[in-house]
Amino acid sequence: MNCISDFFTYETTKSVVVKSWTIGIINRAVQLLIISYFVGWVFLHEKAYQVRDTAIESSVVTKVKGFGRYANRVMDVSDYVTPPQGTSVFVIITKMIVTENQMQGFCPENEEKYRCVSDSQCGPERFPGGGILTGRCVNYSSVRRTCEIQGWCPTEVDTVEMPIMMEAENFTIFIKNSIRFPLFNFEKGNLLPNLTDKDIKKCRFHPEKAPFCPILRVGDVVKFAGQDFAKLARTGGVLGIKIGWVCDLDKAWDQCIPKYSFTRLDGVSEKSSVSPGYNFRFAKYYKMENGSEYRTLLKAFGIRFDVLVYGNAGKFNIIPTIISSVAAFTSVGVGTVLCDIILLNFLKGADHYKARKFEEVTETTLKGTASTNPVFTSDQATVEKQSTDSGAYSIGH
């Protein structure tokens, strides 16, 4: 029966006005902190009154310029930039290991790790290098034997140390970026209206002196990313050129401007002794008069640039404004919960406050009170002072 009785109960709020300087100051201080948080952080900093578009649409076109010297040759853009289409990801080659006049055939491996004494050491379980292992151990020189391969011969020797193209430090990168926020049908580009042809020809990007110049010097990009050019050019690496578009569309159109930042994207592989840096291979193919094909194999080390575009835009909208305002006013009530905890557990006279705040009323209690004191309400008023709030009692302190 007790379970049934407990189930069929009803709870209602009893309002108690506590006139205490301590709890009053705490209550107002908490309310002030909550209001300050919503006004300062939520509304002003996070702009919760705006609807935001994070689905930025972007296109990037790049162009590299500069000349360098490498292996007694003058290198231009067609020699050291790949791919040539001017995409958002491109590589500037700074060092190459060249293996010329390779033809299809049989030849010994040239690396020390393929050294052998007998054919049994050149089985298919051995990891191949420059081609398919034939299973034979052949003479590489008069003093060394290595496993034979079938493929492009002679095989590559990539353990030699080659110089780097130092002129690449002064190459320039031109970036043309266009963005669009589809929710607001807002379009803009990094070539700002105040840039002239004269400015484009002579300006170089600098985060303070020329933050909107679209032409970047390679050496500056490497420096802004916290890297050493000579070391990076020798081993290769991947750098990120980040263009951020964070726009408040409640402001003027010309205040939506790009912000450039730079970082190394392969920082983890840089510390690896297994495969540090960045390199790749490609070949140039030729044919002799008799129709035989041969090629020049190039192992290229270079700096890969990834142009990364990100951003979001915000604009005033009544719906998020109402939602944020309601959340702010509702959160003010959190102060009441905190003050109740302090009032009922930590302040002097906590038991007295608990007795006033929580009261259990049953039908038996009401009948007994009514029979012994017909003017119960008026008598109670002599003990407790009725406040101006409806249904509230004031407890002095």
Swiss-Prot record:
Residues that bind Ca(2+): D158
Residues linked to a glycan: N139, N170, N194, N290
Gene: P2rx3
Family: Belongs to the P2X receptor family.
PROSITE patterns the UniProt entry points to: P2X_RECEPTOR
Activity regulation text: Has high sensitivity to ATP. Fast activation by external ATP. Exhibits rapid desensitization. Sensitives to the ATP agonist:alpha/beta-methylene-ATP. Subject to allosteric inhibition by AF-219. Mg(2+) and Ca(2+) slow deactivation of P2RX3.
UniProt name for this protein: P2X purinoceptor 3
Residues that bind ATP: K63, K65, T172, S275, N279, R281, K299
Record keywords: ATP-binding, Calcium, Cell membrane, Disulfide bond, Glycoprotein, Ion channel, Ion transport, Ligand-gated ion channel, Magnesium, Membrane, Metal-binding, Nucleotide-binding, Receptor, Transmembrane, Transmembrane helix, Transport
Recorded catalytic activity of this chain's protein: Ca(2+)(in) = Ca(2+)(out); Na(+)(in) = Na(+)(out)
NCBIfam families reported in the protein's UniProt record: P2X
Subcellular location: Cell membrane
Description of how the protein assembles with itself and partners: Homotrimer. Forms heterotrimer with P2RX2. Heterotrimeric P2RX2/3 has a ligand dose-response profile that is distinct from either homotrimeric P2RX2 or P2RX3.
Residue stretches spanning the membrane: 21-43, 323-341
One GO biological process term: response to ATP
Residue positions binding Mg(2+): E111, D158
